[in-house]
Design a protein with these regions (language model features):
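Residue-level recognition of beta-strand termini and adjacent short loop/turns
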Residues: 40-41, 98-100, 157
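Sec-exported extracytoplasmic/periplasmic mature domains
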Residues: 20, 24, 55, 72-79, ...
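Aromatic- and charge-enriched surface segment that lines or borders ligand/interaction sites
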Residues: 35-80, 105, 190-193
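Short, well-ordered beta-strand elements
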Residues: 1, 35, 45-48, 67-70, ...
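Surface-exposed binding/hinge segments that line
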Residues: 49, 84-131
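N-terminal lobe/hinge region of extracytoplasmic solute-binding protein
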Residues: 1-41, 72, 145
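Ligand-site clamp/hinge motif
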Residues: 166-210
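Gly/Pro-rich hinge or "lid" segments in bacterial periplasmic/extracellular proteins
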Residues: 23-24, 120-174, 178, 188
Length: 211
């Protein structure tokens, strides 16, 4: 679920969401799985009021306990070495308190001005289905399960990753039914795939292979 490279992040951001996010083409912080939030006067406590009626892709409920489970595992002393952003985002977090089913408070050890901005980086703070974490021994690499507009279908290593539209998504439905992320390492081969109609979009192409 946690990504530290650009290509994986492009996939993860379709599957997972965080409490807050960046507005399109902007650095403004806007609601996502949290509808609103309050910050204490001393900047040490962030209380998030969560969106109700949201389901994970496996049909389980998104709630405050799910947030706590996800964030607790990234706190200092709990984070594993594959959690590249844990120290950056959660290093100053003291604890996470479930106030009620849809309210959660994050307490900090010291005020951190960019805390919300850091939390908006979904690649480092995705909300994963607690059931999926439990069922897969905390490794959902092969079975990612979030609340996002697309659901994971398959990952064929070195070939492609296939996602399908989440028909039960709480927000605006995705416009495309399926998305296939093809893994084509060679720059020239990516350009050929685009020109042949085998790909709709490509990226990471060097200028010297484009006419």
């Amino acid at each position: 679920a946690l990504a530290d490279d650009g290509e994986s992040t492009k996939i993860n951001t379709n599957i997972y969401e965080g409490l807050v996010k960046y507005a399109d083409d902007s650095t403004e912080i806007v609601p996502c799985l949290a509808e609103s939030w309050d910050v204490s006067d001393d900047g040490l406590s962030y209380t998030f009021h969560l969106r109700q009626g949201v389901k994970f892709h496996d049909g389980t409920d998104f709630n405050a306990e799910a947030v706590k489970i996800n964030y607790d595992r990234q706190l200092p002393g709990n984070a594993t070495e594959n959690m590249s952003y844990a120290g950056f985002i959660f290093g100053s977090v003291k604890d996470i308190v479930v106030d009620d089913d849809y309210t959660v408070t994050i307490n900090l050890t010291e005020a951190q001005t960019p805390f919300l901005a850091n939390l908006a980086m979904v690649q480092g703070s995705p909300i994963v289905s607690p059931k999926a974490l439990e069922d897969n021994n905390n490794d959902v690499t092969q079975a990612p399960c979030g609340t996002g507009p697309y659901k994971f279908v398959r990952w064929d290593v070195e070939q492609d990753v296939i996602l399908e539209r989440n028909e039960d998504y709480w927000g605006e439905p995705a416009k495309t039914k399926n998305v296939i992320f093809k893994i084509i390492k060679d720059n020239s081969a990516r350009v050929i795939a685009l020109n042949n109609g085998e790909a709709d979009i490509i990226d990471g192409v060097d200028s010297n292979v484009v006419d």
